[in-house]
Amino acid sequence: ILDRIKFQIYPKFLMSASFPTHLEVEAASKCQMKCPMCWTTYMKENVKGLMKMDLYKKIVDEAAANNVFSIKLSWRGEPMLNPNLIEMIKYAKKKKIKHVAFLTNAELLTKKKSHELLESGCDYISISADGVDEIYDKIRFPAKFEETVARIKYLKQIR
């Protein structure tokens, strides 16, 4: 409970703990989509990549040693492009990180991946959508709104 209080209350009073209570770790700094409003669409290729598991483990080990409450495995890129994403989630949970989450465009959310994510211990997944139907299809190219909705429904169904 104390970790949750620090995580939610400290920032409101412009206070900080001696170590962050939440980390955002970019599992992937690249994306398979070309959304017009997104930074990754315009980033140079030499700064796009995937976080290596050995570096991730060092970050999580230090975070766990300092009682970090939560880790989000995304920032600008699509974390599901990282083939180690499931292992990353499991490792953080094994190290007693209480909340592990990520943001995705859901384009790589296959039925198999949905099951793996549920079994990994991931606490929540946030899915980006910018409108519906044709608007979504235009902004989230090459994604298709109905296909994305079907993937989300499947994940909800098996949850």
Summary of predicted features, one role per range:
Residues 127-129:
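Conserved phosphate-donor/acceptor-positioning beta-strand/loop module used by diverse small-molecule
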Residues 1-124, 138, 142, 146-150:
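Conserved alpha-helical substructure of the radical SAM core
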